[in-house]
């Protein structure tokens, strides 16, 4: 059994005052508060959401 590829996303800037679709991308990744880190599957959909809000998150892996 192989493990699925994942990457970590950390919210480093506030969602207040951001575009609604950027807030939706952060929520879609499971990010809630500043410095909240989640591990998500490395899929094109998740990569796209993380890249869309690149200025608010730190991506590892």
From Swiss-Prot:
Pfam families: Ribosomal_L30
Signal sequence region: none
GO biological process: translation
Molecular function GO labels: structural constituent of ribosome
Keywords for this protein: Ribonucleoprotein, Ribosomal protein
A Gene Ontology term for the protein's cellular component: cytosolic large ribosomal subunit
Listed NCBIfam families: rpmD_bact (TIGR01308)
Listed HAMAP family: Ribosomal_uL30_B (MF_01371_B)
Subunit structure, as described in the record: Part of the 50S ribosomal subunit.
Sequence similarity: Belongs to the universal ribosomal protein uL30 family.
Protein's recorded name: Large ribosomal subunit protein uL30
């Amino acid at each position: 059994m192989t493990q699925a590829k994942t990457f970590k996303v950390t919210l480093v800037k506030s969602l207040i005052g951001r575009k609604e679709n950027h807030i939706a991308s952060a929520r879609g990744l499971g990010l809630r508060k500043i410095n909240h880190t989640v591990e998500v599957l490395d899929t094109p959909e998740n990569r796209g959401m993380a890249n869309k809000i690149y200025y608010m998150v730190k991506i590892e892996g």
